[in-house]
Amino acid sequence: MGRGKIVIRRIDNSTSRQVTFSKRRSGLLKKAKELSILCDAEVGVIIFSSTGKLYDYASNSSMKTIIERYNRVKEEQHQLLNHASEIKFWQREVASLQQQLQYLQECHRKLVGEELSGMNANDLQNLEDQLVTSLKGVRLKKDQLMTNEIRELNRKGQIIQKENHELQNIVDIMRKENIKLQKKVHGRTNAIEGNSSVDPISNGTTTYAPPQLQLIQLQPAPREKSIRLGLQLS
């Protein structure tokens, strides 16, 4: 009779568990060594017991070299997988966008009245309903835009009207100030003209005009006459 099938589960008995670990560990390390020799493979095995004891095997090199190679190759494979996954993702995106573009192009051609030969009465009625709905939406949007523009124009008109009113007030103030200045200037001019038109001074019945002064420029005497006068005085 053959050996019965062993159930793979944790061994409860600690002694049996330790014996089984020792036997199978030795067998695993032996198989790893045989694999590296027979197949010229680089093999690294790391085992930790339940108590934390380390057992390892490295073929033809150190365990550090095998781990470094493992990490390097694992990273390369990860990058390749990511790159391949990214390519597949974008391929699916391109296919989906192409389908959407084709559908939108067909809808556009139908909306503009092209390629209607393959449509029945129901399809045409649905297309008409879509056009009516779209037209209502367009009109509603247009009315909304026009209403907004009218409100904006009214607002700007009110601002301009307010600015004009303020400017008119400033002009009125400046006009009043100008009138005041003109009155002051005319008053001073009239006063000056009145003073200059007063009658000459009167003394009883005789009127005396104010004397007019005239500057007389002295002329130098001739040289001979000066000499004579000098002799007479001497």
Swiss-Prot record:
Induction: Induced by nitrate in root cell culture,. In roots, seems induced by nitrogen (N) deprivation (e.g. nitrate free medium) but rapidly repressed by N re-supply (e.g. nitrate, glutamine and ammonium). Slight repression in shoots during nitrogen (N) deprivation. GO terms for cellular component: nucleus. Disruption phenotype: Impaired lateral root proliferation in nitrate rich root zones. One of its GO terms (molecular function) is RNA polymerase II transcription regulatory region sequence-specific DNA binding. InterPro entries: MADS-box/MEF2_TF, MEF2-like_N, TF_Kbox, TF_MADSbox, TF_MADSbox_sf. GO terms for biological process: cellular response to nitrate; lateral root development; positive regulation of transcription by RNA polymerase II; response to nitrate; response to nutrient. Interacts with AGL16, AGL21 and SOC1. This is MADS-box transcription factor ANR1. It comes from Arabidopsis thaliana (Mouse-ear cress).
